[in-house]
Amino acid sequence: MAISQERKNEIIKEYRVHETDTGSPEVQIAVLTAEINAVNEHLRTHKKDHHSRRGLLKMVGRRRHLLNYLRSKDIQRYRELIKSLGIRR
């Protein structure tokens, strides 16, 4: 269910704002999106796994808050990010 450390590092390299960036909203949203997609795939086969479903809902809520924050701070970065991640909003 969880994404591997290698995959997480690839995502960080792709979405970071500067060389040592690991905590910008873009990076956090991209990592959360990858984790959400992994849990979503898990739930397709394990429909009764309600514990994972609750974790998924918490991740989606956290991503939504980060997206709202990014939209309020820089609308252009927000639009580029949702386009590159394929998030419909």
From Swiss-Prot:
InterPro entries noted in UniProt: Ribosomal_uS15, Ribosomal_uS15_bac-type, uS15_NS1_RNA-bd_sf
Protein's UniProt keywords contain RNA-binding: yes
UniProt KW keywords: Ribonucleoprotein, Ribosomal protein, RNA-binding, rRNA-binding
KW Signal (keyword) present: no
GO biological process: translation
Function, in words: One of the primary rRNA binding proteins, it binds directly to 16S rRNA where it helps nucleate assembly of the platform of the 30S subunit by binding and bridging several RNA helices of the 16S rRNA. Forms an intersubunit bridge (bridge B4) with the 23S rRNA of the 50S subunit in the ribosome.
PANTHER family found in the cross-reference section: RIBOSOMAL PROTEIN S15, BACTERIAL AND ORGANELLAR, SMALL RIBOSOMAL SUBUNIT PROTEIN US15M
Family per similarity comment: Belongs to the universal ribosomal protein uS15 family.
Known partners and oligomeric status: Part of the 30S ribosomal subunit. Forms a bridge to the 50S subunit in the 70S ribosome, contacting the 23S rRNA.
Protein name: Small ribosomal subunit protein uS15
Organism expressing this protein natively: Staphylococcus aureus (strain NCTC 8325 / PS 47)
Annotated gene: rpsO
